[in-house]
Amino acid sequence: MITGRTALYGVVGHPVAHSRSPEMQNAAFARLGVDAIYVALPVAPERIDEALRGAHALGFQGLNVTVPHKPRAASLCHALDPVATAVGAANTLRRTRDGWEGFNTDAPACRSLLEAAGVARGSRALLVGAGGAARAAAWALVQLGTELRVAARREEAAAELCRDLAAAVPGADLAAADFEDLEAEADAAAVVVNGTSVGLPGHEGRLPPLRFRADQVVLDFVYGDTDLARAARAAGARLVSGEQVLVRQGALAFTIWTGQPAPEADMARALEAREGAR
């Protein structure tokens, strides 16, 4: 039951109606008996500054941040954890007296899932995209010791990501790649990560069709039955789905907010239940 003492949490994005985070986080609150509610908060890009100030004024205890607000959210926090600082993007905010403290849970979520999928040190990796999610994936791939190539439609964005991460992680092996050579880069890679919003509801555009192999690991940040995920499954590649990333990063966020271990299995079941009801 919602009362005057119920703590407020939410996810900020544009668009955000498709988000599965409310089902997942509310299931976690219910499982552990936390008096809290989590809602989706649609915020246009030009309103993000006032939205974060307003959420703090309204007493929200924590927020997740999704496309396209992660880099801007990091710049609006009064403090950042070391990963968010290195990545230059924040996807989890925790209320403090002075404002928001920013964290990046996408990056450690990616690292743990890719490591579990068998990504080996020294392997070649291709990252597609240069936004907030891509920056988190780049950090994860660098931490795993891969030879990373970053391809984005805007070449300068890929180059900027590489410069920023090289400065934050000395010794990182990464460089920008030509987006026009995406198919060849994917063929040469042992790991392919889609860090773009292609496949997300409300986002136009497609990636060039990529052919995968059974010996590759493919991670798609976008959840659902995307073209990329279907191609990876058809090839027998080891697929790390957007749902897996969502659950893992959400579990890390839950712990940041509550100080309690997240009921990750319950969170995953909440996503499966929604998918089954569609």
Curated annotation (Swiss-Prot):
Reactions catalysed according to its record: shikimate + NADP(+) = 3-dehydroshikimate + NADPH + H(+)
Residue numbers binding shikimate: S19, R20, S21, T66, N91, D106, Y223
GO molecular function, one term: shikimate 3-dehydrogenase (NADP+) activity
Residue stretches spanning the membrane: none
GO biological process: amino acid biosynthetic process; aromatic amino acid family biosynthetic process; chorismate biosynthetic process; shikimate metabolic process
InterPro entries xrefs: Aminoacid_DH-like_N_sf (IPR046346), NAD(P)-bd_dom_sf (IPR036291), SDH_C (IPR041121), Shikimate_DH-bd_N (IPR013708), Shikimate_DH_fam (IPR022893)
Top-level taxon in the UniProt lineage: Bacteria
Catalytic machinery residues: K70
Residue sites binding NADP(+) per the record: G129, A130, G131, G132, A133, F221, G242
Function noted in UniProt: Involved in the biosynthesis of the chorismate, which leads to the biosynthesis of aromatic amino acids. Catalyzes the reversible NADPH linked reduction of 3-dehydroshikimate (DHSA) to yield shikimate (SA).
Similarity annotation: Belongs to the shikimate dehydrogenase family.
Official protein name in the record: Shikimate dehydrogenase (NADP(+))
Species the sequence originates in: Anaeromyxobacter sp. (strain K)
Gene encoding the protein: aroE
